[in-house]
Amino acid sequence: TMPWGDLWEGTGDLFSRKWVWLIGLLIPAALLMVVRSKLKTRIDEMNKDVGYLRRDSQAHTPLSLLYTFLIAAPVPLFLVLLAAGLWVQPGTFTSVMGAAVAQIALLWLVFEVLYRLLKTNGIAQRHFRWSMEYNHQMRRRLLVTGLALIPLTFLVAFGDQWPAQLSNDRLGLVIMMASMITIMVSLPWVAQSYPGRHYSRTMRTLATALCILAPLTLIVLTGVGYYYTSVRLTGHMIYSLYLIALWIV
């Protein structure tokens, strides 16, 4: 059974005895929240400048991307600070949950950035000339994929920090199968929605096939008893998705 009591005790100790330290660490996240509206306004202004000779510049796109990362950063930054606090608490379970919360922070940052890039009249549409229809399709399908990845990040954290617990983790096995099936359905549609004008139909087909085969392989491994192996490989798959998203941007 999971020692939930240790988690609540460690979290309570973190907030009761180290609240001054937490407040100090939360100042950067609060500052980012304060300047979000100004950053959004600046991004909108630069989006309108794109395509106009006298107002456009080579710095517009990298600055817009940087501002988007800063806008998306407050919640992930808070989660990272919470994860660091849990990590230093005594007990294996609190350390595992700290690692899991850190994984959630990275997931949140990546998908919020992508979601903001793909909004109507956003950076993808104005700077990269992606069509609004493709952007809307990708946003919907990325949302499904991101939600399916949330429980998987917890499983990966347990596999990294507390592998012995996976041997009796029946609930985790069911969650693993359900999440992988969801990803196997949603991720290929994301690949199909990508408006890669410079990619041939063969490359698009290969990318779609890979998006199907990767989760399908993990489903098969889980089904035949290699649960720990599939959890470890899931971590590599998630990190690969992050790198692909960064490469696309």
Enumerate the language-model features and the residues they cover.
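Non-catalytic extracellular/periplasmic "stalk"
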Residues: 1-2, 249
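Short, aromatic-rich amphipathic segments at membrane interfaces
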Residues: 2-18
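Hydrophobic/aromatic interaction determinants used to assemble and anchor large protein complexes
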Residues: 13-249
